[in-house]
Structures are given as C-alpha cells and as structure tokens.
Amino acid sequence: MLSAVIKPGINDYLGTLRVPFLLLNLSCVALGAGCAFWRRGSIDWTDALLALVGAVCAHASVNSLNEYSDFHTGVDSRTIRTPFSGGSGTLQRHPAMVGYALGIGLTCAAVTAAIGIYFVVACGWRILLVGILGLVTVSLYTPWLTRRPFLCLVAPGLGFGTCMVMGTDAVLGGDYSMAAFAASMVPFFLVSNLLLLNQFPDVEADRTGGRKNVLIVHGIRAGAAIYTLFQAGAYISVIVAVVVRILPPLSLLALLTVPLAVRTSIGAFRDGTDRDKLKPALGINVLINLLTPLLLASGLFLSR
C-alpha cells in the first residue's frame, strides 16, 4: 500500500534509460574517433560530441522501449533482478510511468534520427548505410529481433560495432575505412557477448515472455560455448588486423583484457545455471566491454 503512494524520483526517471550502461557508448564512439584520428591526424571534436549524443540517444531508446515492452509482456515481473540483468524494475514499482517509458524511448529515437539526418547532409548519403541499419536495429530489437536467436545474438554487436564505430569514423574521417571495420569487430563480438551473458539469469522469464534467444533454443552449455568463441573472436580480430597492417601495433593494447575474458568464459561454463555465482562474471563482462574498446582507441590515438 505504501509503494502505491510513493512518487517517482529522479532515479526512477533515469531508471528506464539504464544510465550506467550508457557508458558503453563513450567507449565505442571513442574507438570510432580513434580510427578517424589515426587516419587523418585531426578530427572535428564538435562532430565527435554530436556523434556521441546520437549514440547515447540510440542506446537509451532501446533500453526504454525494451522496459516498456517487458512491462507489457510481464518478462520483468518474472525475473529475479541482478545489477546487470532483469530490467531496472522501475515500471514494476511505478506502473503509471509506462507512458513515460514509451515517450522517452520514442523521443530519444527521434533525436538520433535528427542527428543522423544532419550527418547525411554534412557528409553525404553514404552515412545512410549505417544510419538505416542502426534505426532498424533500434526499432526492431525488442518486438522482433529478440524472437530470432541468431539476430538477437548479433544485433547488439551490429549496433555498437558496425553502426557506432564505423559510423563515427565515417562522419569524422570522411568515408568508411578498413581500419574502422577491423576495429568494429571488437565491440561487435564483445557487446553481443554482453547481452548474451546477461541473458543467462533470465532464461525462464524470457521463455515465458515469448522470446527466443540462443540460450532458450540451444541451452546454457551451447550459450557458454558461443560466448567463448565470441570472446576469442574479439581479440583474434585485433591480432589479424595488426599482422596485415590494417591497424597499428599499439592496437595490441586491447589484449590487456584477455585475462578478464578468460575468467568470464570459465564463469559462463561453471556458473551458467547459478545466478548468484554468475554475478562476478557479469560484472567483469561489463568491465571488458568498457575497457577493451578504450584500450584499442588509446592505441590508435597514440599511433598518430
């Protein structure tokens, strides 16, 4: 009865946006900016900031619309939340905020679209390629992509890797580049894995909510194997890019997080069915996603 009269606070209004997770955008935009800086020797920092705003709004839109959808399907009501999975719980505490979640999600998507239009006008139609892919991913992720196992797996990586890194590099560097494509493989694999590991504690709730991810279709063990392959893919892509001279040698700074990746892979196999024991791996997984693109970006900036 008491919860019914408690008014939403600032943390509740920020809750549907999943603000702590928005730090990931900074890492990915920094990586795209690093690619452009390494290629050109300078970048327009105003455009870099605008690209960051667009990226943050795109991510916030997905988060808020996902909370809206999970409230209606009941997914978040059936999950046992961890700091990294199960939704924010905002709409369960304040059901009247459901309209706000939808509104802020659509508003953030509109801001992203407006920034995208600006860059198309300023930089040319080629930017539309990643722009359209990004908007499609944002729009379809919760209602459609989460019900198709392979697309659900790779959609986060496409959004943060292909769209965010290559898009930032293109608007700051003037065109797409092989350097950005190679660099984008790091967040492609790691961010796909971020969402994959976060799905481990939510398998049963996602199943009853109509979702169909790789864990539901193929099981926890197969999910842990895919997670490990994707972790390896992120680091192997950097090594290959340096060997064939697409990226400079200092890009190997990204390999500093390999020991952390080994720990999370072991955790996925050993603790995949135990929510409490998996929590340390979930936290380390977030750290890997934040640090690895930043280390790679640092290597690119220092190589100029």
Please report, for each region that a protein language model flagged, where it lies by residue.
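Membrane-embedded alpha-helical segments that form the functional core of polytopic membrane enzymes
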Residues: 31, 37-65, 129-135, 139, ...
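Acidic (Asp/Glu-rich) catalytic motifs at the cytosolic membrane interface
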Residues: 57-82, 193-215
